[in-house]
Amino acid sequence: MSYSNLKLFALSSNKELAEKVAKTIGISLGKSTVRQFSDGEIQVNIEESIRGNHVFILQSTSSPVNDNLMEILIMVDALKRASAETVSVVMPYYGYARQDRKARSREPITSKLVANMLAVAGVDRLLTVDLHAAQIQGFFDIPVDHLMGAPLIADYFVRRGMCGSDYVVVSPDHGGVTRARKLAQFLQTPIAIIDKRRNVNKMNTSEVMNIIGNVSGKTCILIDDMIDTAGTIAHAADALAEAGATAVYASCTHPVLSGSALDNIQNSAIEKLVVLDTIDLPEEKLIDKIEQISITDLISEAIIRIHEKRPLSPLFEFTTFN
């Protein structure tokens, strides 16, 4: 099928993924340049006509978070002024998602602010993967397509025979139970939950309190939406090992991996950490314990279905990628 009126542009954060998606769809990446003035000010130039086209921008708001967000906003403004028919943002990793509520007095709800900024800039639709808090979809007055990474993670483990009653899918906290239950459904395993208490006065840290469920003599598969400093996932893995788990694997959609993350992973009971490529990882972060799998097919199919006005519901099923 011809996609002559479909354009896909990459900015700075996910160029390799964007190239793979464009190739899978059967189109060329749109021609554009992003540069910074000496004071850090961002300028975007679109180097081809997009008048009347349906345009998709692929960019995660990963580090540097603020630069990547500004690139999106400026690019959207440029596309709108150049008479694009529609502008959709494909944001595999939605930054600022952890600031989705007021945990303490006088705190902002920055997730809502970012949603407002995208809408005011002129975004017609947002496509993202595994929001840290699903209710962020409700911050938008435009359509939000919220894809799941669990089918891809399930495919990884099923292909290695890691499914059934000898395995347990573990949520590292109560907030991730729905995600863990979905993966457990795909892998046909029971689930367990780590009961933890987070120290609100110290960022990126949490304390493991208790394990709800039987993990003794089982291979455990931890699943989370993101891993930042890896303190939570490393402590959870160690707690599972102490509780009698025979092996501990971990998985996440978004490998933020900042600060001491690599040391925490390397020194933990985790045998293998499976991550998606919603965030580009430099070679030095791809240590032996980390294996990255691609969301290329998921994003490509989603873009095609949006462009052709077909439902995205099949993308939520494990059989789509099996």
From Swiss-Prot:
Binding residues annotated for Mg(2+) 2, in chain numbering: 173
> So what EC number does this one have?
2.7.6.1
Q: Which Pfam families match?
A: Pribosyl_synth, Pribosyltran_N
- Its GO biological process terms? 5-phosphoribose 1-diphosphate biosynthetic process; purine nucleotide biosynthetic process; ribonucleoside monophosphate biosynthetic process
Active site: which residues? Answer: 196
Q: Where does ATP bind?
A: 39-41, 98-99
Cited InterPro entries: PRib_PP_synth_CS (IPR000842), Pribosyltran_N (IPR029099), PRibTrfase_dom (IPR000836), PRTase-like (IPR029057), Rib-P_diPkinase (IPR005946), Rib-P_diPkinase_bac (IPR037515)
Q: Which UniProt keywords apply?
A: ATP-binding, Cytoplasm, Kinase, Magnesium, Metal-binding, Nucleotide biosynthesis, Nucleotide-binding, Transferase
Gene3D superfamilies tied to this protein: 3.40.50.2020
Instruction: Give me the Gene Ontology terms describing cellular component.
Output: cytoplasm; ribose phosphate diphosphokinase complex
Molecular function (GO) terms for this protein are: ATP binding; kinase activity; magnesium ion binding; ribose phosphate diphosphokinase activity
In this chain, Mg(2+) 1 is annotated as bound at 132
Entry binding sites for D-ribose 5-phosphate = 198, 224, 228-232
Query: Which compartments is it annotated to reside in?
Result: Cytoplasm
Cofactor binding comment, as recorded: Binds 2 Mg(2+) ions per subunit.
Give, as in the UniProt entry, the pathway in which the protein acts.
Answer: Metabolic intermediate biosynthesis; 5-phospho-alpha-D-ribose 1-diphosphate biosynthesis; 5-phospho-alpha-D-ribose 1-diphosphate from D-ribose 5-phosphate (route I): step 1/1
- Enzyme kind, highest EC tier: transferase
- Top-level lineage group: Bacteria
- Per the UniProt entry, the disulfide pairs are none
Q: Which reaction does it catalyse?
A: D-ribose 5-phosphate + ATP = 5-phospho-alpha-D-ribose 1-diphosphate + AMP + H(+)
Matching entries from SMART domains are given as: Pribosyltran_N
Q: How does it assemble?
A: Homohexamer.
| NCBIfam families hit by this protein | PRK01259.1, PRK02269.1, ribP_PPkin
Quote the function comment for this protein. Involved in the biosynthesis of the central metabolite phospho-alpha-D-ribosyl-1-pyrophosphate (PRPP) via the transfer of pyrophosphoryl group from ATP to 1-hydroxyl of ribose-5-phosphate (Rib-5-P).
Its family?
Belongs to the ribose-phosphate pyrophosphokinase family. Class I subfamily.
Protein name, as recorded: Ribose-phosphate pyrophosphokinase 1
Upper classification of the source organism reads: Bacteria, Bacillati, Bacillota, Bacilli, Lactobacillales
